[in-house]
Curated annotation (Swiss-Prot):
Protein name: Vacuolar-processing enzyme
Chain residues in the propeptide: 35-53
UniProt function note: Asparagine-specific endopeptidase involved in the processing of vacuolar seed protein precursors into the mature forms.
Family note: Belongs to the peptidase C13 family.
Site residues, Required for post-translational maturation and enzyme activity: 265
EC number: 3.4.22.-
Database matches in InterPro entries: AE, Legum_prodom, Legumain_prodom_sf, Peptidase_C13
GO biological process: proteolysis involved in protein catabolic process; vacuolar protein processing
GO cellular component: vacuole
Pfam families in the record: Legum_prodom, Peptidase_C13
Keyword set includes Signal: yes
Length: 493
């Protein structure tokens, strides 16, 4: 296009106005010649496409199911998710946040009052509402909030998901897990069948149009495997299948590393994968399926499954064609971002969720050289943790021997059911067996959650509660759990 020479002699503001006018005219010409082309660069304030944004109200429940500075990453994940939704236009009044809220001001936090979820990331803590913190972070409150039942909430802000039939709900959970369970900082744990029953009840009440659930936890697939209906208008992805660990990342001593002053992991592999994906794409263009495929690849650590996991899908597969903005909202700053791109193609070093605690403790120990008394105390704590882990592993194995004999014990306890079958046939039995075990052998802890499959298999094989109790007494007689007895920690079932 020729530009008249006289224009070059005009003041700067005139030249800017001319080019602005030309840009508008090009856009109008594109619009009159049919459907607007994706190649046209749009302004953040422009409509992305003709698709209506009338989607009812977007709601979200964000849950960090742990506490303690060693579990920094779970609250960081949830705070990051909150900021992403806010940028997408989801209203604060429609987002319910569960987090213990003990890491931002923790004495070990090198940036007091700040939480980050990426080594170069911004503070994600500022502005996050403290709906349910401390002792109010419970599975009971989570269920009450999701059902919109204020009368059942105990403590906290009282905010609930008061959704209507035309509304959409996004649920995100990050913490430790085990076969059939998700952790909570206050006992009991969240059991899979209880969660599914709540989802069924929410659906029966007509309390939403569609729901998307993301779950970050070890063995998170077991929460839905064989028990998640396909007709609830709910789509689920999980960080792992029913028998895998999930992974912490951005950890000290690993690549990519956190800032050198941090002694704990900043995020979780599946969680940072979906959030960093959402932040780098136009969510009015990217579908649920496209994000699933991207997150699946990254969470597998690009098919390095020894240091990654299989992201799984459950529920209503018909929802995968929907655009993500229906749940995460739309950030106008991403208007010119592609629906998918090749960002973050490199592998990441990770740590097993259950070993992240020991990694953190070891970092504290190594950085306490100038404080010999503290170093001795930390070493003692590490030894106690390892001792209890060995006790948990050994006692469960011995219980199996007492119930099934030495030849069959290991195969029965570790047996994994065929894909499509639930972990256990009788969930009440599972809870009973866990309580019997913890009474005599001590709290399972976030590490011992991995033994839930053994207790489920004990139920599936028809062992009575009386026989289980006798085996637990024989296996754990004389063991003193101390602070790890359920009288101090609470029962996980």
């Amino acid at each position: 296009m020729a530009v008249h020479r006289s224009l070059l002699n005009k003041p700067t503001w005139c030249r800017v106005a001319f080019w602005w006018w030309m840009l508008v005219m090009v856009m109008r010409i594109q619009g009159t010649n049919g459907k607007e082309q994706d190649s046209v660069i749009k302004l953040p304030t422009q409509e992305v496409d003709a698709e209506s944004d009338e989607v009812g109200t977007r709601w979200a429940v964000l849950v960090a199911g742990s506490n303690g500075y060693g579990n920094y990453r779970h609250q960081a994940d949830v705070c990051h998710a909150y900021q992403l939704l806010i940028k997408g236009g989801v209203k604060e009044e429609n987002i319910v946040v569960f987090m213990y809220d003990d890491i931002a001001t923790h004495e070990l936090n090198p940036r007091p009052g700040v939480i980050i979820n990426n080594p170069q990331g911004p503070d994600v803590y500022a502005g996050v509402p403290k709906d349910y913190t401390g002792e109010s972070v419970t599975s009971h409150n989570f269920f009450a909030v999701l059902l919109g039942d204020k009368s059942k909430v105990k403590g906290g802000s009282g905010k609930v998901i008061n959704s209507k039939p035309e509304d959409r709900i996004f649920v995100y959970y990050s913490d430790h897990g085990g076969p059939g369970v998700l952790g909570m900082p206050n006992m009991p744990y969240l059991y899979a069948m209880d969660f599914i029953d709540v989802l069924k009840k929410k659906h029966a009440s007509g309390g939403y149009k569609e729901m998307v659930i993301y779950v970050e936890a070890c063995e998170s697939g077991s929460i839905f495997e064989g028990i998640m209906p396909k007709d609830l208008n709910i789509y689920v992805t999980t960080a792992s299948n029913a028998q895998e660990n999930s992974w912490g990342t951005y950890c000290p001593g690993m690549y990519p590393p956190p800032p050198p002053e941090y002694i704990t992991c900043l995020g979780d592999l599946y969680s940072v994968a979906w959030m960093e994906d959402s932040e780098s794409h136009n969510l009015k263009k990217e579908s649920v399926e496209q994000q699933y495929q991207s997150v699946k690849q990254r969470t597998s650590n690009f098919e390095a499954y020894a240091m990654g996991s299989h992201v799984m899908q459950y529920g209503d597969a018909n929802m995968t064609a929907e655009k993500l903005y229906l749940y995460h909202g739309f950030d106008p700053a991403t208007v010119n971002f592609p629906p998918h791109n090749g960002r973050l193609k490199s592998k990441m070093e990770v740590v097993n969720q259950r070993d992240a605690e020991l990694l953190f403790m070891w970092q504290v120990y190594q950085r306490s050289n100038h404080l010999p008394e503290k170093k001795t105390d930390i070493l003692k704590q590490i030894e106690e943790i390892v001792k209890h882990r060995k006790h948990l592993d050994g006692s469960v194995e011995l219980i199996g021997v007492l119930l099934y004999g030495p030849e069959k014990a290991s195969s029965v306890l570790r047996s994994v059911r065929t894909t499509g079958l639930p972990l256990v046939d009788d969930w009440t039995c599972l809870k009973s067996m866990v309580r019997v075990y913890e009474t005599h052998c001590g709290s399972l802890t976030q590490y011992g959650m991995k033994h839930m499959r053994a207790f489920a298999n004990i139920c599936n094989s028809g062992v009575s509660e009386t026989s289980m109790e006798k085996a637990c007494v024989a296996a754990c007689g004389g063991y003193h759990a101390g602070l790890l007895h359920p009288s101090n920690t609470g029962y996980s079932a």
